[in-house]
Amino acid sequence: MNKVKLKLFYIGLTLLLLQSCSHKMSYSSITEPIDDKKVIALSGQRFPWVVEIEQRLKNKGFTVLRYSSVQKVTEKAPDKDISYQQASARYVVQLNGFAPLEWAFRCMGGGYKFNYISAEVIDTKTNQSIYSFNDSGYSENCPPVSGSIFTDLVDGINGLWKN
């Protein structure tokens, strides 16, 4: 009986240590919340986990575009015409990360084990990075070591906007 308890203790300790390997970092450079429509474009490769982030952003009220397209706008005035490029989304989320997609490396619940994931929100009007997120470890749906990568990322982006 003591050997069983000792094995369970070591298994629990190992799982606890694996969970603590995650390193989370986020940074926001805005001082005032964004008072604009929740329209953003996602930039980066279209991995399966990007769909998870996109869906969570939509659940928070965002309109998510695949690209921030640009159209030429001309405003006519009596004395002159003004032409400029107008983007369909002022804010772009640049996503980058690596999580193995092979079945042998996926979590049983459908989650992912990220070697790294990073996201940067860029204001295309000022060409400034206004939010940065970096993490590694397990995403949601990875029992028994599930993390909160997607939730933390989406909550961080949502927190930039005035609700």
Write out the residue ranges for each language-model feature.
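C-terminal/domain-edge helix-coil "capping" segments
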Residues: 22-33, 56, 128-163
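Surface-exposed short loop/turn segments
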Residues: 70-132, 136
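A generic local structural motif
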Residues: 2-3, 26-30, 78-81
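Sec-dependent bacterial lipoprotein signal peptides
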Residues: 1-23
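Solvent-exposed, acidic/flexible segments
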Residues: 43-50, 110-112, 139-150
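A structural "domain/chain start" motif
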Residues: 18-75
